[in-house]
Regions:
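N-terminal Rossmann NAD(P)H-binding glycine-rich loop of SDR-like oxidoreductase domains
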Residues: 3-23
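NAD(P)H-binding glycine-rich loop region in Rossmannoid oxidoreductase-like domains
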Residues: 51-90
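Conserved Rossmann-fold NAD(P)-dependent oxidoreductase catalytic core, especially the SDR/UDP-sugar
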Residues: 96-138
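Conserved beta-loop-beta element that borders a ligand/cofactor-binding pocket
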Residues: 114-115, 148-173
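Flexible, glycine-rich beta-alpha linker
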Residues: 119-120, 134-138, 162-181
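Glycine/proline-rich active-site loop of Rossmann-fold NAD(P)-dependent oxidoreductases
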Residues: 144, 157, 169-185, 212-213, ...
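A conserved pocket-lining segment of Rossmann-fold NAD(P)-dependent short-chain dehydrogenase/reductase
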Residues: 166-176, 186-210
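C-terminal substrate-binding subdomain of Rossmann-fold SDR/epimerase-dehydratase oxidoreductases
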Residues: 200-203, 207-314
């Protein structure tokens, strides 16, 4: 099996590529991104690719005889509000290019991460797969398009498109990349380096989150799931939900001198438009999804690994 990963140098891609290479063989997983310097760190095989460059995308699929695409290239929520036009170009036209290139190039399967940002203020807590989608951000709108276009290509052309609606993803290996849930990573960096963090959301802001190992598990587990068991193309998944204050308290147990304050900015409105909890029972039933990490265990692992990475003792 030959795999192409777009957006391979992002928060998820930089950890997914090594995992897939271990699974399928280094030579069978092609990393692609627009950032050459970061691609070199992932090592070959890699290709410099802007997903808006359809000609290059077609050529890569043909040259490497790609069977599966993990389409991770995207502009995230907060950055998407700073430049909604670019967000539309990359996230909507990019996913269309990937779907069309896959259809014409004989690709068997596409995995597209979606997001809790597809929901909006009208969404009730604990939404299911069929809950109303009325996002208030360009990022969320673009991901609704990705989901619906994926469904369309599956129903019309038989292209096996699958995806998980990821919550905020937390990782110590890669810095956050412009999302509304970045505070859940930044707080750990600040706790170790400065002993203090100013959140850009209110203390009672509660959002669904997931530790990176679980995010990688969800993506790869759904990719390999028995198609006859799948009721949906895109599934809710979640690891945990916690408030900013709860995160502070958990960090304080491990770094007692840590302090925090809360100064909500424009990202607070985005956070308020998303549900605080997610129902992922369909994923549990259809492909045996189950997260491995809770808040306390994740916090301990984050602090242990980040302090080593930053060369700091806590």
């Amino acid at each position: 099996m030959r795999v192409l990963v777009t957006g391979a140098c992002g928060q998820i891609g930089s950890e997914l590529v090594p995992l897939l290479r271990k699974k399928y063989g280094k030579e069978n997983v092609v990393a692609s991104d627009i950032v050459v310097e970061k691609l070199e760190k992932l090592s070959e095989p890699y290709e410099v690719l802007n997903v808006l460059d359809r000609e290059k995308l077609d050529a890569i699929i043909k040259e490497y005889e790609i069977d599966v695409i993990y389409h991770l290239a995207a502009i995230l929520s907060a950055k998407g509000e700073e430049n909604p036009q670019l967000c539309f170009q990359v996230n909507v036209n990019g996913v269309y290019n990937v779907l069309e290139a896959a259809r014409l190039g004989g690709v068997e399967k596409i995995i597209i991460p979606s997001t809790i940002a597809v929901f909006g203020p009208e969404t009730p807590d604990y939404p299911k797969e069929v809950t109303i989608l009325k996002p208030r951000t360009m990022y969320g709108i673009s991901k609704v398009f990705a989901e619906l276009a994926g469904e369309y290509y599956y129903n019309k052309y038989g292209l096996d498109v699958r995806g998980v609606r990821l919550p905020g993803v937390i990782s110590w290996k890669t810095p956050p990349g412009g999302g509304t849930t970045d505070y859940a990573v930044e707080a750990f960096y600040a706790a170790i380096e400065k002993g203090h963090y100013t959140y850009f959301v209110s203390e009672d802001t509660t959002l669904p989150m997931m530790y990176m190992p679980d995010a990688l598990k969800a993506l790869t587990q759904l990719a390999e799931a028995d198609p006859t068991r799948l009721r949906f193309r895109f599934y809710n998944v979640v690891g945990m939900s916690f408030s900013a204050k709860e995160l502070t308290e958990v960090i304080k147990k491990l770094i007692p001198h840590f302090t925090a304050d809360y100064k909500p900015d424009e990202r607070q409105k985005i956070a308020e438009s998303w549900p605080s909890h997610i129902d992922d029972s369909a994923a549990r039933e259809d492909w045996d999804w189950k997260p491995d990490w809770d808040l306390e265990r994740m916090a301990k692992d984050m602090i242990e690994n980040l302090s080593k990475k930053l060369g700091k003792s806590v």
